A protein has these predicted regions:
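Mid/C-terminal beta-alpha module of Rossmann-like enzyme folds, strongest
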Residues: 5, 9-22, 109-112, 184-220
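N-terminal Rossmann NAD(P)H-binding glycine-rich loop of SDR-like oxidoreductase domains
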Residues: 16-36
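N-terminal Rossmann-fold cofactor-binding loop
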Residues: 43-48, 62-63
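Conserved Rossmann-fold cofactor-binding substructure of NAD(P)-dependent oxidoreductases
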Residues: 57-76
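N-terminal Rossmann-like NAD(P) cofactor-binding module of classical short-chain dehydrogenase/reductase
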Residues: 73, 77-80, 113
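NAD(P)-cofactor binding segment of oxidoreductase domains
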Residues: 86-112, 145, 149
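Glycine/proline-rich active-site loop of Rossmann-fold NAD(P)-dependent oxidoreductases
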Residues: 122, 173-178, 205-214
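Conserved beta-loop-beta element that borders a ligand/cofactor-binding pocket
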Residues: 151-172
């Protein structure tokens, strides 16, 4: 689906806050967001991991620090979450998602786009045998269980949320050509997509309401 199936609109420049900005998907969000003229704030534990750039504000903090998250969220127009566990440190991020949501409510920021994964919830049934019987249960179970908790927290909020479920993440250039799947009966086999195209989808949905309050699978 070219460009996610959207009518081309005039670019809207916004104030964006990115969590997970030092990961590969987060970096793709920073690169494309800045290239589009957005004012981007990266919330990171290690500011030295990012280079200073025009239009980029780097804030040091931990997602479990409610005061730091609240300061970062204040004044933003959308929050983009590309958070993922590091080094098998599970159990932390669902609490971080709760803190982000609370900060957004306090600041009056409505749009949250959160990166989850194929294999979470009803999307597991869409995947091929190898993914369902081998890859997910033996290699991804803990990570996807945590993502499912995060999705539940987001769904229970009154924010304008979109959950993004990419297939297997790859390096590669942005193509703008991928499938956006919301029908749980659609079979996808072994889904895959470049991180750059995940960022492309997210940035195309900063104000669009087509996928509002839905989990969207992304794959080629």
């Amino acid at each position: 689906m070219q460009g996610g199936g959207y009518i081309k609109k005039e670019l809207i420049r916004m104030k964006l806050l990115v969590f997970g900005a030092t990961g590969k998907t987060g970096r793709a969000l920073l690169e494309q967001g800045l290239a589009q003229g957005h004012a981007v704030t990266a919330f990171v534990r290690n500011p030295a991991a990012l280079e200073a750039q025009a239009g980029l504000t780097i804030i040091s903090g931990d997602v479990t620090d409610a005061a730091a998250v609240s300061r970062a969220v204040a004044g933003q127009e959308a929050v983009l979450s590309a958070l993922g566990p590091r080094g098998g440190n599970y159990g932390v991020l669902p609490g971080g998602v709760q803190i982000i949501i609370a900060a957004m409510k306090q600041a009056g920021v409505k749009r949250l786009i959160h990166v989850s994964s194929y294999g979470v919830g009803d999307s597991l049934a869409q995947m091929g045998w190898v993914s369902r019987k081998i890859v997910v249960p033996f290699f991804l179970r803990k990570a996807l269980d945590e993502k499912e908790i995060e999705e539940g927290i987001i769904r229970a909020s009154d924010l304008d949320w979109i959950i993004v479920r990419p297939g297997g993440l790859e390096d590669g250039a942005r193509t703008g050509v991928y499938r956006c799947i919301t029908d749980p009966l659609t079979k996808v086999g072994q889904p895959r997509i470049a991180r750059a195209d995940v960022a492309d989808f997210i940035l195309k949905n900063l104000v669009d309401e087509h996928f509002l309050h839905q989990a969207v699978g992304l794959t080629y």
